């Protein structure tokens, strides 16, 4: 028989044991994370479009969009007007009732989402919190310019091939065009869009494309360099993994586009020289006999040949012309089209030979004003060729007929198919000469390698830049460091682990998978961190032989296709 005291002790012991047992069960999960767990739980399920081996599936598809564009450049008013005829081929298994277009020039409107969602950063991080915020004169000028300049695409008409008007709705930097009939799998549709816009002043807003004014030139009113990019309404990509990739263009995130063929004509002042995606179709209409002979000579020359000499460019600068000329370009299987136009351009070229390749001769070319000087004539075209040699060795033969580097002062560096805009220039000295420092030389070499490298990633290996920035910037930063070290091993190319440790120790990092408009520090996160990781993978974990085989196989499999991270 239990006494009351013994019964109390027994009940206490049972309760205590139960409590201990409950605590033990709660603790079994712990905080352990298996760093070597299988990836099956995070990788997407393989399908007929993207197989489990990481290659395009047996039913892989992508859309095709062909453009025929006629554009007119109004230099005096810095305005562009154009008509584009678009053929959209629906290779998807889906029926489409509307199409989405990108109107990237609308990003510069004062009421754009980019401007309305931007935050004011008027003080340095080290400023006293009690100090009033400051706005720079440049920021104030930019705000006033956007308010006054009437920027953005003006869409004048949208119609089909039978000239039926099509309903269209503009939403920020996007436009939805409603089709009169559903576009079924395997069918195509033709549309026409008439548009115009005021070209952005690059010195004020530092955009990816716009105009640069040289008011000190002898010509009355000065001269201009026009760099035209994101200039025409472009089809939004329609993909197997996301459908319409219609994210708003906020500025940081770049572009997701479809491949197609382009025929583009640009009517410009008669003394302008035009550089563009593709190949010039009418040299007899726009170049002198001597310039055409030089261009032919350059194909097999041992060093770059002037197509337009510095003296000829200087004569163009001084005079100006009231006449116009139309340059016609064609490009096959490209995902975009950009061009540059100016009477200031010096033009040099040299043929790059690829024996046995489908494109055996590639014309490497540079276009630059006198402000580029000997820095550009000494290095730009040769660096273009060096980059093609190195990247082709690690991936595939360069498939296009031209590779161009254009000096645009307000663009640090930007790439499009077959053409890049690069910023470094010489410094004007008191005696009128132009010189450049070692740092400026290295900057030009580095930026040309990086931007020409983008011809491969993502202009050919067509990853989604806005969604997964690291897939083009990280891979390209890794490979540009390889090309850079082969050019000059003394230049610090920045992919060794020691260059990323400070960032890796910093606070508020986000995953490299973060969408580009949401990254806190785009440079370290999308460029340096993945480039360093790839470098470690090649040099330490896999070894060069195994890594180089895998990298080349990835490049080959996804050339002219759209890879995703998995």
Regions found by a protein language model. Give the residues of each.
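Bacterial N-terminal signal peptides
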Residues: 8-19
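Ligand-binding face of N-terminal immunoglobulin V-set domains in extracellular IgSF glycoproteins
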Residues: 80-107, 112
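Glycine/proline-rich low-complexity spacer/linker segments in large multi-domain proteins
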Residues: 111-130, 196-258, 262, 283, ...
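Hydrophobic alpha-helical and helix-loop surface patches within well-folded domains
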Residues: 21-22, 32-50, 329, 360, ...
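Hydrophobic helix-coil surface modules that form long, contiguous segments used
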Residues: 230, 235-244, 250-449, 478
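Short, hydrophobic/aromatic-enriched beta-strand segments in well-ordered soluble domains
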Residues: 84-86, 90, 103-105, 187-201, ...
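A surface-exposed beta-strand-loop module
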Residues: 25, 70, 77-79, 89, ...
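N-terminal, polar/Ser/Thr-rich
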Residues: 22-80, 229
């Amino acid at each position: 028989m239990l006494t009351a005291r013994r019964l109390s002790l027994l009940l206490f012991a049972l309760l205590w044991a139960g409590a201990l047992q409950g605590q033990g069960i709660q603790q079994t999960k712990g905080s352990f994370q298996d760093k070597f767990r299988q990836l099956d739980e995070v990788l997407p399920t393989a399908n007929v479009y993207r197989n489990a081996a990481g290659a395009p599936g047996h039913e892989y598809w992508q859309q095709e969009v062909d453009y025929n564009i006629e554009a007119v450049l109004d230099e005096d008013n810095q305005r562009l007007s154009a008509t584009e005829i678009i053929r959209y081929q629906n290779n998807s298994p889906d029926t489409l009732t509307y199409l989405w277009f990108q109107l990237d020039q609308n990003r510069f409107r004062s009421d754009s989402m980019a401007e309305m969602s931007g935050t004011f950063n008027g003080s340095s991080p080290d400023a006293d919190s009690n100090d009033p915020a400051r706005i720079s004169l440049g920021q104030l000028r930019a705000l006033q310019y956007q308010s006054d300049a009437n920027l953005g695409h003006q869409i004048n008409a949208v119609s089909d091939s039978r000239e039926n008007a099509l309903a269209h709705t503009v939403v920020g930097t996007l436009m939805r065009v409603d089709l009169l009939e559903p576009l079924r799998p395997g069918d195509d549709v033709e549309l026409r869009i008439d548009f115009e816009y005021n070209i952005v002043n690059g010195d004020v807003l530092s955009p990816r494309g716009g105009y640069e004014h040289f008011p000190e030139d002898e010509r009355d009113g000065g001269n201009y360099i026009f760099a035209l990019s994101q200039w025409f309404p472009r089809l939004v990509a329609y993909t197997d993994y996301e459908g319409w990739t219609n994210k708003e263009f906020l500025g940081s995130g770049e572009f997701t586009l479809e491949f197609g063929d382009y025929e583009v004509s640009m009517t410009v002042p008669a003394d302008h020289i035009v550089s563009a995606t593709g190949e010039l179709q009418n040299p007899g209409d726009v170049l002198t006999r001597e310039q055409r002979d030089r261009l032919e000579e350059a194909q097999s020359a041992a060093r770059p040949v002037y197509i337009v000499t510095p003296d000829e460019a200087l004569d163009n600068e001084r005079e100006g012309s009231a006449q116009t000329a139309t340059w016609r370009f064609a490009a096959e299987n490209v995902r975009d089209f950009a061009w540059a136009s100016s009477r200031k351009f010096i033009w040099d070229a040299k043929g790059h030979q690829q024996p046995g390749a489908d494109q055996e001769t590639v014309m490497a070319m540079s276009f630059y004003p006198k402000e580029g000087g000997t820095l550009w004539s000494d290095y730009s075209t040769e660096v273009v060729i060096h980059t093609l040699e190195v990247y082709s060795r690690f991936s595939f033969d360069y498939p296009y007929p031209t590779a161009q580097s254009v000096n645009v002062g307000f663009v640090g560096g930007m790439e499009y198919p077959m053409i890049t805009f690069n910023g470094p220039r010489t410094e004007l000295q008191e005696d009128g000469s132009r010189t450049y420092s070692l740092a400026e030389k290295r900057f030009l070499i580095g930026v040309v390698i990086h931007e020409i490298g983008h011809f491969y990633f993502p202009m050919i290996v067509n990853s989604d830049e806005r969604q997964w920035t690291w897939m083009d910037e990280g891979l390209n930063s890794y490979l540009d460091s390889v090309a850079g070290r082969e050019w000059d091993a003394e230049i610090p190319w920045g992919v060794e682990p020691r260059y990323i440790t400070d960032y890796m120790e910093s606070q508020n990092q986000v995953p490299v998978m973060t969408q580009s408009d949401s990254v806190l520090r785009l440079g370290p996160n999308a460029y340096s961190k993945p480039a360093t990781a790839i470098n470690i993978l090649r040099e330490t974990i896999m070894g060069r032989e195994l890594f180089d085989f895998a990298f080349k196989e990835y490049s080959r499999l996804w050339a002219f296709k759209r890879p995703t991270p998995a």
